Regions:
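12-transmembrane solute porter fold
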Residues: 17-33, 38-40, 279-492
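Structural signature of transmembrane alpha-helices in multi-pass secondary transporters
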Residues: 31, 60-63, 67, 117-118, ...
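Transmembrane-helix bundle of Major Facilitator Superfamily
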Residues: 2-196, 375, 445, 449
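Membrane-helix interface/capping residues of multi-pass secondary transporters
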Residues: 53, 83, 107, 138, ...
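Hydrophobic residues within membrane-embedded alpha-helical segments of Major Facilitator Superfamily
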Residues: 30, 39-42, 71, 93, ...
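Alpha-helical transmembrane segments of multi-pass secondary-active solute transporters
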Residues: 56-57, 86, 144, 178-182, ...
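Hydrophobic transmembrane-helix bundles of small-molecule transporters
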Residues: 169, 173-299
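Intrinsic disorder in cytosolic terminal tails and internal cytosolic loops
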Residues: 1-16, 203-221, 484-493
Length: 493
């Protein structure tokens, strides 16, 4: 066999890791293109359907919330029943929901279908991480995560441009619908390739052999399947109660859910510990967090997602509403950011296996410096300079995003047992989703508060400077966590 090939117990067939990656990358790109294209198509969608501001907010929030609450339970189910099967189920749900969303007659129907889209994406996402952990090791795993970073960069670049072109060619109504419809051929291709290239039942036997000392065995037949339904429900409620206030700020009462979410998280941790102490197999083995690479890696990654995604949100708002730039022009301006992110991911993929902790530190410092440079660019734009000045610091931020993503995924999942790859990946992504929701709420809130200062009520400079100051602070916190992780890794070496 070549270095790209592998077998699984119970089958004489030889599988190819390159084919496996192709299958995994297709839905990843579908989901990310969907996010970036929908963000850019919201004005057209609002006009075509006559949507209210609260309805439009749920076009985004419903999708994100559904992903957040499904990730960890779906990862657990994949670890038990087989990741390939759950992957195909998630991809099927996402594809069918995308087609139906493109045909939605009202915003209410669209929002319901967006929830189903989020469920599909939430089911398949942890399986991708689990499958990489299971079938890739060492530098091959690092390269796989680097290719994921490249796919993310391409998707982020394509989304806004694709939606802008579709709306320009077909008008507002057909244009936003086309953004959903493009998922049908891609999803069908992913399902066909997955049916031929994923191991399915053989994978479960392989997991069973892997699980001799690390936890619950996974086999084709067994007398008891321990799903820990109470733990699953507690975590779903916790994620929902914490994320909802930051994503639906139409009424002050929603902030009362936040302390309930924190309480729910405390109860969930206590339940999982007690459940394991009684000889059961909890949904999430909290001992995973005692692994320095996984525990600190999850924390560092979540902090990074508090600093990073909010930047693009406020830049898009500022350029379109404050400077008067079109949606397509914003997409073109952020294209160099996406390209440099791809380069950062590939560069990091070559070096993360040995220098991943140092790359994390470098990336977070680069976010701090480039955010300060972006503030200077905004100052110049407000004084008459071209808005293209903002593209320069965004290029460096893109490189930092790509480099950090590949390094953090590699380090965080490095010591995770293959049998826990799905649940570990789901928990990691849940932390990132929650951090993103919290960050966007805080940073955009500061942005609009600053923007309202002054007699004119449109002080865009103050809004951007204050918001970027928050980003710099969050990035500095991430740097601190990354430095701690770097010191631990140096001692291990």
């Amino acid at each position: 066999m070549t270095a790209h090939e592998f077998t699984v117990p119970g089958s004489s067939r030889v599988y190819d890791r390159r084919q496996l990656l192709v299958v995994l990358l297709i839905p990843l790109m579908m989901a990310l293109v969907q996010v970036s294209s929908v963000n850019n198509a919201l004005p057209a969608l609002t006009e075509a359907l006559g949507s209210s501001p609260s309805e439009v907010q749920w076009v985004l929030s419903g999708y994100t919330l559904a992903i957040g609450v499904v990730l960890v339970p779906a990862g657990r189910l994949g670890d038990i029943f087989g990741r390939s099967s759950l992957f195909m189920i998630g991809l099927t749900i996402f594809t069918l929901a995308s087609l139906a969303a493109g045909l939605a007659p009202t915003t209410l129907v669209l929002n319901i279908l967006r929830v189903f889209q989020g469920i599909g994406a939430g089911v398949l996402s942890p399986q991708t991480t689990g499958l990489i952990v299971q079938y890739f090791e060492g530098k091959a795993r690092t390269r796989a995560f680097a290719l994921f970073g490249l796919a993310v960069a391409i998707s982020v670049a394509i989304g806004p441009i694709l939606s802008g072109l579709l709306i320009g060619w077909f008008g507002n109504d057909l244009g936003w619908r086309g953004g959903f419809a493009v998922n049908l051929p891609l999803g069908a291709l992913g399902l066909i390739l997955g049916a031929h290239w994923l191991p399915f039942g053989k994978e479960r036997r392989a997991l069973g052999l892997d699980h001799a000392t690390t936890g619950q065995p996974v086999v084709v037949r067994r007398e008891k399947i321990d799903l820990d339904p109470v733990g699953s429900l507690l975590l779903v409620l916790t994620v929902l109660l914490i994320m909802l206030p930051f994503m639906s700020r139409t009424s002050p009462w929603v902030w009362g859910l936040l302390p309930l979410g924190i309480l729910g998280g405390t109860v969930w941790v206590a339940w999982e510990k007690r459940y394991k102490a009684h000889g059961n197999f909890p949904m999430m083995d909290l001992d995973l967090l005692k692994l320095p690479t996984y525990g600190l890696g999850t924390l560092t990654g979540s902090l990074f997602f508090m600093a990073g995604p909010a930047i693009m949100a406020i830049v898009a708002i500022y350029l379109q509403n404050g400077v008067g730039v079109s949606a397509l022009s914003v997409g073109l301006l952020t294209l160099p950011n996406a390209i440099s992110s791809g380069f950062g991911a590939m560069w990091s993929g070559r070096h993360s296996y040995v220098h991943g902790a140092a790359i994390q530190v470098l990336s977070t410092i680069l976010i701090v410096v480039s955010s300060a440079a972006l503030a200077f660019a905004v100052w110049e734009i407000e004084n008459g300079a071209s808005y293209w000045w903002a593209a320069i610091p965004l290029v460096f931020q893109g490189f930092a995003f790509g480099a950090f993503g590949a390094a953090n995924q590699t380090l965080t999942m490095m010591d995770v047992p293959r049998t826990h790859g799905g649940i570990a990946g789901g928990f990691l992504q849940t932390g990132q989703r929650m951090a993103t929701a919290i960050s966007i709420a805080i940073v955009t809130g500061v942005f609009f508060a600053g923007q309202s200062l002054g007699s004119s009520g449109s002080n865009w400079l103050a809004g951007m400077l204050l918001a970027l100051g928050v980003v710099v602070f969050l990035a500095a916190l991430t740097t601190t966590s990354a430095l701690v992780m770097w010191r631990i890794e140096r001692k291990r070496a």
